[in-house]
Amino acid sequence: MTTTTSRLDAQIEKHLGLIDSLSARFALPLHVFFVEEMEANAEAFRSVAAAQYPRTAIAFAVKSNPCRGAVRLAARFGLGADVASEYELQLALEEHMEPATILCNGNAKSDDYLARAVSAGCPIAVDNADELDALDALLRGTGRKAQVLLRFRGMPLAGLTSDDQTTAADWTKFGFHIDEAPALFARLAEAATLRFLGISAHIGTQIAEPGGYERLLDHLLDVARDAQSRGLDVEMIDVGGGFPVSFLSEDEWTAFQASLLARLRGDVGASGAVTWNDIPMGYARTAGDQDSTWIGKAYWSRVPIARMYQHLLCAITRNGRSVVERLHALGDPTLVIEPGRSLMANAGITLTEVMGVKRVLEHAVVSLDMGINNHGTNLISPDIFPAAVLPRRESDVPETAFLAGRLCFSGDMISKAKVKLNRLPRRGERFVLYHTGAYSADHFASNSCGFPRPAKVAIRPGGTAELWRAPETYGSVHGASAEDLTIRDV
């Protein structure tokens, strides 16, 4: 147990009988979410907003856990939604979220997505000029207007984190460059089919240090002021999400970084490897030397979850005023935040079964009855998730191990960083991965190697459960052997 898993361990202990029953009914692997933990995270954001900037709108990033159960909870907790497709939009509307609280995002919105957003009256974060043209063509002559924000990139955020984690610097597929703002504002001021609501940007994901957020907000507030100076009303500023979660404790995180850096510099031998095949993760070589600067996904933050938002509202910007003071000067626009990982990650676990343990170059490798398609964030960047063998025993002797998946390709590693386990397991023992409530179950989920996707269940505080996704079966994935595959009437 680490300090970051103590709450989840308490939930497992509290609901152990129910978890056993759910595991027997739906089989392993099994994604389990705890409603109480998600609600605590939502309440933390609501409390910060109420105390420091009540004109905050909290929009749950549906892509972090795209299922009806999670969206229904978000609606019950009084949240809106950040949606990234027409299907997420439909889900949010079906769960009775107010259209004005559903932010429609995405860099490649279909005509259908745009039409649905306009019909419902949802704000649209416009990504590019073609989207503006598409909206204009859709609405020309109707007397109606689309509610739009302009999404921007090009803020000075280079070196903040790895390229696959940031979405507001220069090298990103999202948004207009901030240099385009004056021309865009001029177009919106004259548009007959577009109603300007405000501006938008999204810094990225799992941003552990506040400095990048401070730079982003500083520039966004400047852009908002420029829009006002050109006669536009700025009713809304959407700063996105990316609020961090501490997967590890501070001591665990700094120890991992120190061990990895020592290995990459050659200070320790092969037995001291802490990543698979010595992948550098957030470290990079420069001019032939091993740089000691970590640029990549971080697994601990001094201001996790809602504490990051609290810090940002109080942050002092370049002109010497706090973010809240500058918002007041702009007329108190609605400030939209889009938490996803920070609401869901530490509300979930994944249970699976151990298939075997072997040694590879002196290192323990635990093979699990799940694949990277059930833990998809690893396909973006190598992740570090705490894990344990169940049940825990007083006689446990801690060991470190790499975690391997069951898919038939060598990149299927559940953890390319060595994970500290309470003991080395045996085949057939139950195994838990912590903090898998966001993205893991759904991001890149697939039927690789013919495996069905596992069930997702949620446990309520009172000890009852919800089925968030039924487990797929052989038949639902592959069909029946007698099925006629001919396409007719085409």
Tell me the role of every PLM-derived stretch.
Residues 64-66, 87, 108-110, 128-130, ...:
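Active-site-proximal loop/turn and secondary-structure-junction residues that shape catalytic pockets
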Residues 1-147, 191, 195, 229, ...:
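A charged N-terminal "starter" segment
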Residues 18, 269-490:
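Charged (often Lys/Glu-rich) extended helix/loop segments that serve as interaction or gating elements
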Residues 70-73, 92-95, 135-140, 161-163, ...:
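Distinct, well-ordered alpha-helical segments
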Residues 57-59, 78-80, 101-103, 123, ...:
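Structural preference for beta-strand elements that scaffold enzyme active sites
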